Amino acid sequence: MFKNAFANLQKVGKSLMLPVSVLPIAGILLGVGSANFSWLPAVVSHVMAEAGGSVFANMPLIFAIGVALGFTNNDGVSALAAVVAYGIMVKTMAVVAPLVLHLPAEEIASKHLADTGVLGGIISGAIAAYMFNRFYRIKLPEYLGFFAGKRFVPIISGLAAIFTGVVLSFIWPPIGSAIQTFSQWAAYQNPVVAFGIYGFIERCLVPFGLHHIWNVPFQMQIGEYTNAAGQVFHGDIPRYMAGDPTAGKLSGGFLFKMYGLPAAAIAIWHSAKPENRAKVGGIMISAALTSFLTGITEPIEFSFMFVAPILYIIHAILAGLAFPICILLGMRDGTSFSHGLIDFIVLSGNSSKLWLFPIVGIGYAIVYYTIFRVLIKALDLKTPGREDATEDAKATGTSEMAPALVAAFGGKENITNLDACITRLRVSVADVSKVDQAGLKKLGAAGVVVAGSGVQAIFGTKSDNLKTEMDEYIRNH
């Protein structure tokens, strides 16, 4: 049961990365366009704002497509089925909800009582994915043969969406009310506590690759903002981009991603044994620059996560504290994907107290460096370069990586599902005991996570390319 649950949660987390991947361009367009910079012609600002806003307005549909593709090995039919399912489900609720709630349709629409948001998109995507996996090989009588196989999937998905829409018309209002209550509490009533908890739990979920699921309600659901054109935005990211002065509560990520973790990487480098310091320095400086520029932190985190869990617990606590600090000091900036220098500069149009970020950030860096340096020495933690015995990894060329990786995962017969997100290979295997974790690390994995039949190998931003190479190798050999 646990094996299947973790494998499915892995797929959910991975599938959410496709819609999240459109946020950078949408965020830049909406953020820059809404900022109304004096050096940018008004018509250009308007076009950019409308273009970016259109993506955020259709996020439920984009999430529906992403979830469907994530559970069907990127089969395009499931994406079409997800679009059909979402459209039918929404319209079904629009008709049935007024009958259930005994309220005019206009009042239901104005109060968003039947608005399922991105969660509705995820539900629609799940319907399409389930129907695809269940019916894509279905055989029908000869006179209905045209609708057999994959063509049947959008049809059955649409029918299932009608049933789902009717059911949601009854159960969604109380669920939506609870979500709205939490949204109001987190966004407006007590954001200090809410985002402190968010930051801590989000880091705790990183080792399992499940943080993408936790991010969705905070990034795309909480709070509500209506701009001058009457467009409604939900979620901290879209609201900030649209110019909501109460948004930007996710800004704490800049403190530990641009300053804290890079300082921790330097502390690990300085703590390495003299004979290993040059080698470790190259790795850590590269990881620190990645975190500082892009906000991608896994290369640093996985270097100490398993060998020194006490450091990771402290890091999770400091990450959680970063969000309340920014909120209490009135520091706001925007993020579209992660909290790196690129986001910090490009999305600063609606920011507040931008000058405080480097000041507080340097203070955070000092805290991180001091804690890591002291604890590594005092507890003799085996961070990179301090191992009792090290074995040099053999350099492996790009052309050799695919077969070596397949072999490390136990051979192609042992691989039951192959996928990747931004920083990690996500592989389901038949027999975990056949996976060579040491071999994966020699090939460059910053860490390996095993839970049930799911194996995650953290290779950084090249993971998706490695997945493509492995997929081609498996098909051709």
Curated annotation (Swiss-Prot):
GO terms for cellular component: membrane; plasma membrane; transmembrane transporter complex. Transporter activity may be inhibited by SgrT. Disruption phenotype: Disruption confers resistance to cellular contact-dependent growth inhibition (CDI) CdiA of E.coli strains NC101 and 3006, but not to several other tested CdiA toxins. Disruption confers resistance to cellular contact-dependent growth inhibition (CDI) CdiA-STECO31 of E.coli strain STEC_O31. Changing C421S: Unable to be phosphorylated and to catalyze the phosphoryl exchange between glucose and glucose 6-phosphate at equilibrium. Remains susceptible to CdiA toxin from E.coli strain 3006. Still allows binding to Mlc. It is found in: Cell inner membrane. Its EC number is 2.7.1.199. Homodimer. The dephosphorylated form interacts with the Mlc transcriptional repressor. Mlc and the EIIB domain form a complex with the 1:1 stoichiometry. The EIIB domain is phosphorylated by phospho-EIIA on a cysteinyl or histidyl residue, depending on the transported sugar. Then, it transfers the phosphoryl group to the sugar substrate concomitantly with the sugar uptake processed by the EIIC domain. This is PTS system glucose-specific EIICB component. It comes from Escherichia coli (strain K12).
